[in-house]
């Protein structure tokens, strides 16, 4: 299977992640919430822990729901990425005790 297919969240995986998280994981943590922000007002997206650009797989263990605000902050925020990734990792580890970052990355010859 091609890398692009394996790094994308398919519809089945997206559905499972949305049902599992029930909204933005960072909003639930009240992480850097602007005073004027209303929960979910910007819509929701599925975020990769290991980015697709780095071979991050489109699997449940590599994704979580984020609102557009927090997803943008994770990808483009100044001085927030490290802290957000630590929180993201803690969240995923709480769900998957055997969670291992190395298992989230594409390797040549793998299949879904």
What role is predicted for each listed range?
Residues 30, 50, 73:
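Catalytic metal-binding/acid-base residues of hydrolase active sites
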Residues 8-45, 67-69:
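Short cysteine-rich loop/turn motifs with clustered Cys
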Residues 2-5, 53-64, 72-112:
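Polybasic, low-complexity binding patches
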Residues 2-12, 46-53:
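Short Cys/His-rich Zn2+-coordinating modules
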């Amino acid at each position: 299977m091609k890398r692009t297919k394996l790094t994308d969240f398919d519809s089945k995986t997206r559905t499972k992640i949305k049902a599992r998280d029930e909204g933005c994981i960072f909003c639930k943590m009240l992480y850097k919430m602007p005073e004027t922000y209303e929960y979910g007002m910007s819509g929701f997206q599925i975020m990769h822990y290991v980015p697709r650009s780095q071979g991050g797989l489109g699997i449940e263990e590599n994704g979580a729901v984020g609102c557009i605000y927090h997803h943008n902050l994770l990808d483009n925020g100044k001085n927030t990425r490290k802290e957000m990734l630590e929180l993201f990792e803690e969240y995923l580890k709480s769900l998957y005790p055997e969670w291992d970052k190395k298992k989230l990355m594409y390797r040549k010859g793998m299949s879904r």
